[in-house]
Amino acid sequence: MTVLWVAAVIALACLNVIQFIMKKKRDGNLAYTADQLSYMLSRDSAGQILLPTDDHALKDLLVNINLIVENRQQISAQFAKTEQSMKRMLTNMSHDLKTPLTVILGYIEAIQSDPNMPDEERERLLGKLRQKTNELIQMINSFFDLAKLESEDKEIPITKVHMNDICKRNILHYYDAVQSKGFQAAIDIPDTPVYAQANEEALDRILQNLLSNAIQYGAAGKLIGLTLSYDERNIAITVWDRGKGISETDQQRVFERLYTLEESRNKAFQGSGLGLTITKRLTEKMGGIISVQSKPYERTAFTITLKRMTY
């Protein structure tokens, strides 16, 4: 009996020692975890807390802490990206709005400074003033649209889109402009229904931008075209003209924000230098790509490529 009591006492003593050691080790691990977490938060570090342990509860705690830290970093990065985008937008706006505001102010001063101005001249200036004011409003809207696209605030729902109808609708939208300027139009849209993963509103804006560019810059060639083609995996819409074209240097930069050199077509969208930038962002939002090829007075073509849907 005495031996059993001694064995029991020894077992309890060993158990207490083991529990003490485990508690001390856990306390040390928790203290280390707390120190590492404090360090990461104070330095805004993107690291993780790595600690080899057999303690399942502590493992779960570390996993959750690392997930929280990772999520915090993602939120911080998104905030920084949005803030940077807004700063760029405000900088570009302040620079790009000066010219139209100066023109508008000039019209106002001209009207105010001459009380005896003939009614016909006054109406002409008021018409110009109205036009420039509308352009300014459209420009501001474009800035905000681009800011939303770049900050990921603008969601573009992707659905199955009938590409034949989209192309026909948009070319018809510019029929009067094509006719009035004496253009010929080469339209190649297949009879076979073609579908793509896209967004109708985004496609309308893209095609309207590209077609208006082709009309404006293709005047020398008097010919514009729209082609819808497809293979097993992709569809492609190409808008082309035979105008003065785009130099190789400008082809590399034509999609940049506010790139408005004389040879560039980015200026065409309400004169803001945002049209092709917005076009590129919208295309990318739909999982597509946009490319440009140009030989002056032969063929300047912008091609949008999207994933085809066959089901």
UniProtKB/Swiss-Prot annotation:
Primary localization class, coarse: membrane
Transmembrane regions: 1-21
GO BP annotations, alphabetical order: osmosensory signaling via phosphorelay pathway
Gene3D superfamilies linked: 1.10.287.130, Histidine kinase-like ATPase, C-terminal domain (3.30.565.10)
Membrane topology: Single-pass membrane protein
UniProt-recorded Gene Ontology molecular function terms: ATP binding; phosphorelay response regulator activity; phosphorelay sensor kinase activity; protein kinase activator activity
SMART domains for the chain: HATPase_c, HisKA
Protein location: Cell membrane
Xref: Pfam families: HATPase_c, HisKA
InterPro entries linked to this entry: 2-comp_sensor_kinase, HATPase_C_sf, His_kinase_dom, HisK_dim/P_dom, HisK_dim/P_sf, Sig_transdc_His_kin-like_C, YcbM-like_HATPase
Topology, Cytoplasmic side: 22-311
Group of enzyme by EC: transferase
Catalytic activity, as annotated: ATP + protein L-histidine = ADP + protein N-phospho-L-histidine
E.C. number: 2.7.13.3
Start and end residues of each Histidine kinase domain: 92-310
PROSITE patterns registered for this protein in UniProt: HIS_KIN
Keywords, ordered alphabetically: ATP-binding, Cell membrane, Kinase, Membrane, Nucleotide-binding, Phosphoprotein, Transferase, Transmembrane, Transmembrane helix, Two-component regulatory system
Residues carrying Phosphohistidine: 95
Keyword DNA-binding: no
Record function comment: Member of the two-component regulatory system YcbM/YcbL. Probably activates YcbL by phosphorylation.
Name used for this protein in its record: Sensor histidine kinase YcbM
Organism: Bacillus subtilis (strain 168)
